[in-house]
Amino acid sequence: MNVAGYISLLVILSLLIGYLFGSIMFADVASMILKRNVRELGSKNPGTTNSFRVFPKKVAIAIGFFEIIKSVIPFSIILLIYKYGLQPELTKLDPSVINKTYYLTYLAPLAAIFGHMYPVYFKFNGGKAVATTAGFVFVVSPWWFLIIALTWWTITLISKYVSLASIVCFIIFLFLPYIPWLDYLWWFSLDKITFLTYQSDWYIIVFFAIANTILSTIIIWKHRGNIVRLINKQENKITKKV
């Protein structure tokens, strides 16, 4: 197989594994087990926030955890496939191609996010993917994760509006790729502190800029109902149970 073949294989595996894993809706799984349909109660959204309204707290926490790691797990699988399967073969063919392809492993968590929003197992009717995107943020950069996590928790604790915290975070998320010293792809740089630069890594910055723009646009659009309710002061707080 040539270089193009291995790169195509990496892209296909990343998209396929990420999407299929992301399509697992843990709130729906809990609904089946507990006989309490998350899609018919509260905001009717099969996500983490509504799970706190519908299910016992421990169950909701578990759902939130699994929603986060369901973008981390496919990335980890693809990372192992890349490092121990594809990278050695690519190195034999053209060592210079490694620095131009490794970031494609991040297609896996991106596909997981779209799997959550449009799950094949649930007729493409999914959630808003806030928690699943948090997993993507975590595997991209600890600095991204720290900024987003602190912002989200601060706004949520003060306002009690998870939707408001999420919307603000995705506005910030939109601009993070344009600050290169925050783009620390730590899974590939565990031995030293490093970051991307416009001079040598511009195509990776463009990759994440496009990805973040698409995600922010779609997820904020999915919150359009929340925005209207926030403006009209009709939005439910996280503390409200059903």
Swiss-Prot record:
Catalytic activity: an acyl phosphate + sn-glycerol 3-phosphate = a 1-acyl-sn-glycero-3-phosphate + phosphate
Pfam families on file: G3P_acyltransf (PF02660)
Pathway: Lipid metabolism; phospholipid metabolism
Keywords of this entry: Cell membrane, Lipid biosynthesis, Lipid metabolism, Membrane, Phospholipid biosynthesis, Phospholipid metabolism, Transferase, Transmembrane, Transmembrane helix
Location relative to the cell: Cell membrane
Bilayer topology term: Multi-pass membrane protein
SMART domains reported in the protein's UniProt record: G3P_acyltransf
Entry superkingdom: Bacteria
Record field: transmembrane: 7-27, 61-81, 102-122, 135-155, 162-182, 201-221
Family: Belongs to the PlsY family.
Record-linked HAMAP family: PlsY
Function: Catalyzes the transfer of an acyl group from acyl-phosphate (acyl-PO(4)) to glycerol-3-phosphate (G3P) to form lysophosphatidic acid (LPA). This enzyme utilizes acyl-phosphate as fatty acyl donor, but not acyl-CoA or acyl-ACP.
Assembly, per entry: Probably interacts with PlsX.
Protein name, entry field: Glycerol-3-phosphate acyltransferase
Biological source species: Mycoplasmoides gallisepticum (strain R(low / passage 15 / clone 2))
Gene: plsY
